[in-house]
Amino acid sequence: MKDLLQPMRGESVLDIGCGTGACLSALHEMGLQVTGLDPSTYMLDMALEKMGNRVELYRGFAEDLPFDDNSFNYSCLFTTLEFVNDPAQALREAFRVTKDRVFIGVFNRYAIKGIQRRVKGIFSPTIFNHAQFFSVWELKQMIRTIIGQVPVSWRTVCQLPIPSGKLVTNLEHSKIVQRCPFGAFAGMVVVLVPRFKTRPLAAPYQAKDPTGAATG
C-alpha cells in the first residue's frame, strides 16, 4: 500500500471502512494525519481502544461520506468494496473527498484463494457469503466509468504454493510476480486529475464605424 500510495508525511488520509483499525495503525506509522470511518459502532469502539486519540473516528457509510469535497490528500478502501451495498457510489464518494490519490485493496475475484472462498461459502456460512469480489480489469473499468481516463497503478500479492524461505519471499515481492493479475490480493492506486468547469464570459466589445474618416 505504501509503495503504491507514496504518501508524504504530515498529510491527511481517510480510511473508509476502517473496521477495528488494522489499516489505521499502518497509516499512522507512515506519519499521516489519520481519520477513520465505519458504519459499525462495535468496530469503531475496537479501533478507538487500539488507536486512542492518535486518530479521528466517525460513524458513517462509504456511499455517503460526511465530509466536504477535497477534505483529504488520500483515501483508502481496504477490503471495503466487497461489503458495501453500492461499490460504484462508494468510489464516487472517495474520489469526491480526496485531492490526490485513492488506494483500493480487494480480494481478487480470479485468484485461487478467491475461488476457494466462494466454494467454501456454498457449504458453510462465512463472512464472505455476501461479499462481492472484483478483478483488476473490473476495478479499472469501474474507475474509468466514474471519472474517465486517469492514471491507475496496481500490484497483486501472490502466495506461491512452495515452502517459504528467503528466495520465495524475494520472488513473491518481485515486480514480475506482483504484476500477475491473478494474485490473491490486488492493490490499486488512482491518481486524481483536477477537472474544471468553464463557462463563456460576456466581454464588452464595440465595433468600429466603417464609414469613419481616416486620421493622419
Q: What residue spans do the PLM features occupy?
A:
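A short glycine-rich, Lys/Arg-flanked "PGG" loop and its adjoining helix->strand segment in the class I
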Residues: 88-100
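Short alpha-helix
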Residues: 130-154
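Conserved class I S-adenosyl-L-methionine
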Residues: 10-19, 101-126
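Conserved alpha-helix/loop element of class I SAM-dependent methyltransferases that forms part
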Residues: 1-11
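A conserved beta-strand element that flanks and buttresses the S-adenosyl-L-methionine
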Residues: 76
